[in-house]
Amino acid sequence: MRLFAIGDLHLPGGEEKPMDVFGTQWENHMERISEDWREKVQDEDVVLIPGDISWAMQLRAAVPDLELIGRLPGKKVLLKGNHDYWWNAISQVRAHLPEGMYAIQHDAVETDAAIICGTRGWMLPTTEAEQTQEDEKIFHRELMRLKLSIEAAMALQSPKPLVVMMHFPPLFEAERDTPVTELLAQYPVHTVVYGHLHGAGIRAGFNGEWKGIRYRLVSCDALDFRLAEVALKDL
């Protein structure tokens, strides 16, 4: 059983939302992702999708996109991104998921290879950009939700590696000590996967080990629209 990750699929949600307006690299992006997915993923594998799944504004409009993902091999674990406006009450979201798909919200799920938890996150307070009062409020709320999700994972008392999903970056290449990384360091986190960064912003992302935890940027254009395997061997 293997673990993969890819985020920011930005499926159309029943609307004309051609992603190539963001650059020619986005042409037929889901077809390319699907082809790579089918080549790599077996039914027993798990794929993590950390947010920005569909442009849909309502849950019913997101259902065809969820069904498209559901037809691809493997089990899937989903996390809400900042553009997932269709993601409302978690009970309703879960009721509309195809078999073999799980949505995380303030909790954790145990797979055959790892424990998965996480939260959306928010814009980090950095030396490059100040937070507004509203940003600060949302950020601290997301920090508490991350702690809640990790605590749910710890309550499972499993020896399996702990993998955290986030949508917003928990750190940057130039700024690695953040309130998020400080919280993560309090727990036996093995790997963190995150997305949100696109285009020129990809260069700001951090990939590698920081204070004993692996971090991997998995927004789909950062991966050239190919799934990333999450290595679960000991650090």
Please tell me what each predicted stretch does.
Residues 9-12, 87-175, 234-235:
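Conserved catalytic scaffold of divalent metal-dependent phosphoesterases
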Residues 14-19, 90-91, 128-129, 177, ...:
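Short aromatic-enriched loop/helix-cap "lid" or pocket-rim segments at secondary-structure transitions
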Residues 38-39, 154, 230-233:
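Short amphipathic alpha-helix with an adjacent loop that forms part of the alpha/beta core around
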